[in-house]
Amino acid sequence: VNKKRREANQLNARIDRLIAEEIERARKRAQEEARREAAARKKADAKDKTSSGTGTVARPKSEPLDAFTMSKADRELSGSFVANRGKLPMPISGPYIITSRYGQYAVEGLRNVKLDNKGIDIQGKPGAQARAIFDGKVAAVFQLNGLFNVLIRHGNYISVYCNLSSASVKSGDTVSTKQAIG
């Protein structure tokens, strides 16, 4: 039980770190996009001033960036993801069983021992493939304890696929709904 708990904590810590890094990259992309838009507006304003030669119209200043802002593409993808809530496909092809549900659970045969699961555990038959639940971009692929783990960004959302025997995608790849990832 301690080994399983230690491995789960190690995996969760790695995933949390990668998600934090992905959020920071998205924040920087959004800031860069906002900077480019501001520069384009400034250039257009300067062009308007020189062409009209009289009077200026004050444009409202753009709002300051929030702690986490998204690019336009990420906002659109997030909206699509939310709109499909409850309609997303299973992240595995073929027959499967759910071996562990989300949240705390008691370990069979051990009194007063509880573990916490941050997702659901799905076991497929040999040859089953893990697949993306929605369009997105692969944020990270890493190996831990000999198994592959994949994080896919869907705008403001990230889906995590753990304990895969192989990975058929790499960081930066664009994936579509139901595409095999491992």
Each predicted region: which residue ranges?
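Generic structural signal for buried aliphatic residues
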Residues: 96, 136, 175-181
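Extracytoplasmic/periplasmic cell wall- or extracellular glycan-interacting regions that localize
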Residues: 2-140, 146, 153, 160
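Short hydrophobic beta/alpha edge segments that flank linear recognition/processing sites
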Residues: 122, 149-150, 176-182
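Short C-terminal domain-edge/linker segments immediately following a structured domain
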Residues: 126-131, 152-153, 164-170, 181-182
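Short histidine-centered loop motifs in beta-beta connectors
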Residues: 141, 157-178
